[in-house]
Amino acid sequence: MLVETVAIERDVHDVYRAFADITYWKQVLPDVLGVELLYDDGRHQEFTMTVSRPGGAETVRGIRFCEENRRIELVQPQPPPSFRRMVGVWTFEEAGNVTHVKAERWFELKDASVGPLDGFRDRIATYLRTNLAHFKSHLEATR
């Protein structure tokens, strides 16, 4: 499991709303090339997202379960190439005028031939840290 955290100087509602609105990600994250929202009833979401990676564009299909202002769980029935499975969760906790966001990821590679596990772990951790930093910068700049 990988865990990354960030403290964002915004109330939990604004922070949660930014993470929950998957179409908004294209405005915040420079590597997101496109998002197609397939289903959203306010609690359950299904989407595809295409991101730019060093090896070219990658498209994933995700399903998210959202608990307003508390938590977003993710499963990717179509994970990134080289992965058999990718799941995760974001949790949101407000303390005063700061919201603490914790991003957790669990993954399984398709097989050992795709490369060393540590390299994938480091890459996913870097993407998580970078994404959290982009959300922090964007949300704190748009008060």
Task: Give residue ranges: language-model regions.
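Short structured motifs
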Residues: L2, V32-V35, F47, L74-V75, ...
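Hydrophobic ligand-binding cavity/cleft-lining segments
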Residues: M1-R43
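Beta-strand/loop substructures that line and gate deep hydrophobic ligand-binding cavities in soluble
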Residues: P77-T130, S137
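Generic structural detector for well-ordered beta-strands
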Residues: T5-E9, E36, F65, T91-E93, ...
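Glycine-rich portal/gate segments that line the openings of hydrophobic small-molecule binding cavities
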Residues: K26, E36-S82, T126, T130-R143
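Short, surface-exposed coil-to-beta transition loops
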Residues: M1-V3, A57-R61, R84-G88
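Surface-exposed interaction/gating patches
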Residues: H13, T99, A141-T142
